[in-house]
Amino acid sequence: MSRISDRFASLKERGEKALVTFVTAGDPDLATTEKVVLELERAGADLVELGVPFSDPMADGPTIQLSSDRALASGTTLPAILELVSRLREKTQVPIVLMGYFNPIFAYGSERFAFDAAQAGVDALLVVDLPPEEAAELKGATDSCGLDLIFLLTPTSDSSRVAMVARQGSGFIYYVSVTGVTGARSAVADDLAARVTEVRGALELPLVVGFGISTPEQAGEVAQAADGVVVGSALVKYFEKYQGAELLEQLGGFVSALKQGVLKGSR
């Protein structure tokens, strides 16, 4: 079993849902990211998604776009992110997902990247702009290296799309809760629970829900239906306001509150 499968299995045994936290690697620099990942885990994150900064992040709203810009300005590269994960693996076994766009992976070389990512200790890749029907080469590479490849479902995904993602995905399935780009929203969609329950019934893999979840209350509401909850933009906003030890303290407090919300929704 992979680290991700192990984590979901242990959570299920305890009757808990997963809190998945997203931050951009290299915002404001990779040394800070290393400390942030350890703090996220300490505060209650069950899995960590590291965003790979990209100059044209089409699926991301302004908060994560600005975060990506800050990371690129600090000189963050894909090889440097893999070195960061290697350092983290000396200190933590928290499952780590690299989330980003295909262009940097293509430039690196799919097979070489999958191998290097696995060697560094990455657990999974989530490539936002690579649908399963275009992912054969990368999937072959990730399968051979023991990496999970995570695909997206959206509110407009029909049953055939759900079936395709169920066949080709591994680790977990990421359900995008809203149409549009990433970003915090004031409320969860009225029909989200029913739709998530419907999709989840067609899957063997865990289903996590992300995009737009920004409060402990929303996290708890989503956790009632899903296997896990992803919080990204609401966390990334802290990087606009705080630095150093204060950033870690503020992030830790918020993640602890999110975890309590998820636990409440798990019951």
Swiss-Prot record:
Regions crossing the membrane: none
Record-level Gene Ontology MF annotations: tryptophan synthase activity
Known pathway: Amino-acid biosynthesis; L-tryptophan biosynthesis; L-tryptophan from chorismate: step 5/5
Entry-linked Gene3D superfamilies: Aldolase class I
Name of the top EC class for this enzyme: lyase
Alphabetical list of PROSITE patterns matching this protein: TRP_SYNTHASE_ALPHA
Recorded superkingdom: Bacteria
GO cellular component: cytosol
InterPro entries: Aldolase_TIM, RibuloseP-bd_barrel, Trp_synthase_alpha_AS, Trp_synthase_suA
EC number: 4.2.1.20
Chemical reaction(s) catalysed: (1S,2R)-1-C-(indol-3-yl)glycerol 3-phosphate + L-serine = D-glyceraldehyde 3-phosphate + L-tryptophan + H2O
Keyword Amino-acid biosynthesis among UniProt keywords: yes
Keywords tagged on the record: Amino-acid biosynthesis, Aromatic amino acid biosynthesis, Lyase, Tryptophan biosynthesis
Active-site residue numbers: E49 (proton acceptor), D60 (proton acceptor)
Function: The alpha subunit is responsible for the aldol cleavage of indoleglycerol phosphate to indole and glyceraldehyde 3-phosphate.
PANTHER family: TRYPTOPHAN SYNTHASE ALPHA CHAIN, CHLOROPLASTIC, TRYPTOPHAN SYNTHASE, ALPHA CHAIN
Family annotation (NCBIfam families): trpA
Subunit-structure text: Tetramer of two alpha and two beta chains.
Stated family: Belongs to the TrpA family.
Name of this chain's protein: Tryptophan synthase alpha chain
